Amino acid sequence: MAYSSKPWGYVIYRTTYTPESTSLWPRAIDTINTYVAHFTLETLTEQNKESSYEEIISRLENIPIQDPTLDGATYDELRVHFASWLQTQDRRGESGDRDLPRARFRTFLVIDQAALEMIANAPNPADEGADPRAVSRPCLTAVAAQHHEGRRLRPTRSARGPRDVNEGQLFPGWMKVPIFTLHELWEANSERLDLIELCPSDFVDEPVWEP
């Protein structure tokens, strides 16, 4: 897994402020951290690197952002807020490099009411007998911090077929991400891959990332 010695984790926006959401929000954040920790350990174990788990997970730092003025905010409105937030975080180390991990500049996460309810009520993946389908179902939205309308995804097609820059679907600037894959999304972002390079091109209603 691609981790530097810096803190890692995403900025997570809350865009619903109903009375019910106030109690669900901290549960949802706890659930996300639980899932990231559980599946990070699972991946490290598969790679025979579980000895590094404690050090890696100690640097996990998802950053929840709550602001009632963002109730129902659009992705473009969140991009403006995110850009302003980054300006307050743009510290530089002794080498002159940014202290923030690169992946945190490229993508942020959004939780609306539907996602909030699903995540807050998700089962603990470590529980014996947890339904795998229930574990894999909760999703949130990953949003590209910078998005230019009109960019297209690479079409899924035979390499021998004719190429046309206008053949791929338009990239919406976001995709749904199951929370059990967030550690893999971070790794992909850390390897200099933007959402447009990760977003599936064969979606019908909405893109859902599958690593």
Identify the meaning behind each predicted range.
Residues 151-211:
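Acidic, proline/glycine-rich low-complexity IDRs
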Residues 1-172:
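Extended, charge-biased low-complexity segments
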